[in-house]
Amino acid sequence: VARRMSVSEFLPTASGADRTAPQAAAQPNRVSGGLVDRARTIAFTFDGKRYHGHPGDTLASALMANDVALLGRSFKYHRPRGLIAAGSEEPNALVTLGQGVDQTPNTRATMVELAAGLSAHSQNRWPSLRFDALAVNDLLAPVLSAGFYYKTFMWPAAFWEKLYEPLIRRAAGLGRLATSATADISDRGDLHCDVLVVGAGPAGLMAALTAGRAGVRVILADEDFAPGGRLNAEWAVIDDAPATGWVRAALAELASLRNVRVMARTTVFGAFDHGTYGALELAAPGGPPDAPRQTFWRVQARACVLCAGATERPIAFS
């Protein structure tokens, strides 16, 4: 099942990017640097409104550049919420991708690779994100404390099944699942290696390089579409050169080693008995229509190196 991959597959490819489209006229928060290719423009929509971003953007970074700060509503009181993180730890910017049978709810905008024609919608609001009628819950906060439904809706008993429970169920949850079967294809497979490296930041890249140079079979898995971890977002210097250059060189060497497989867009979600690990790989945007949209891998590894990094807790929650 394995195939050879080049370093270009882990860098912004501008799949579906419009080279002739004008640059976004008003992106007050657009900053320089990073892996964003500002020479090419991608059109996408959020809640039906058209915006522009660039190859290398995530949905979150493109919305931020376009001065879109409100991305969601809190679960219970429907208070306005924006970004507080940049990766899979983001709790607020949960969106629905696509429409109809192809829609995917509860997707973190910080993990969505921007692609031409991307359609995203906010969740947990009615009738719109900016004017959410259920924000009235915030005014009722004193009587909607934790576990209020176990005390408030006890009488009359006949109302529970017919009235109270349907109302609570409608208010609960965030995104909505598609009600019909999708035409998208999912697949599964098995992989075997000597060393599984989880995370392709600086530590993960070095671990994969060290093991790969030793001649053992290596799988390097990273949840992001651009391996490099924090080096992609910092002005770091390695060996008197920008860290992004070191990442490119490391990926190029790994791609040249036949005993190494680099898997971007792949989340290792569990470690099980006898060296078995579960991983979910997502397809890159713009791939063949008959290709699997996602693949579940069962990985058998003799050893695992966990290089998942760390996430600082925001001071507001310390």
Q: Where are the predicted features?
A:
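Residue-level recognition of oxygen-bearing side chains
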Residues: T58-L59, A203, T267
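Signature of N-terminal electron-transfer/Fe-S-associated modules in redox systems
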Residues: R3-L174, T182, L191, T295
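General beta-strand structural signal in soluble alpha/beta enzymes
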Residues: G53, G72-R73, Y77, L220-D222, ...
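FAD-binding core/adjacent interface of flavoenzyme oxidoreductases
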Residues: R79-G82, S122-V198, T244-S318
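Residue-level signal for short segments within beta-strands and strand-turn junctions
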Residues: L97, D222, A279-E281
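Short coil/turn connectors at secondary-structure junctions
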Residues: R38-T41, H54, E89-N92, L191-H192, ...
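Beta1-alpha1 glycine-rich phosphate/pyrophosphate-binding loop at the start
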Residues: C193-L254, I315-F317
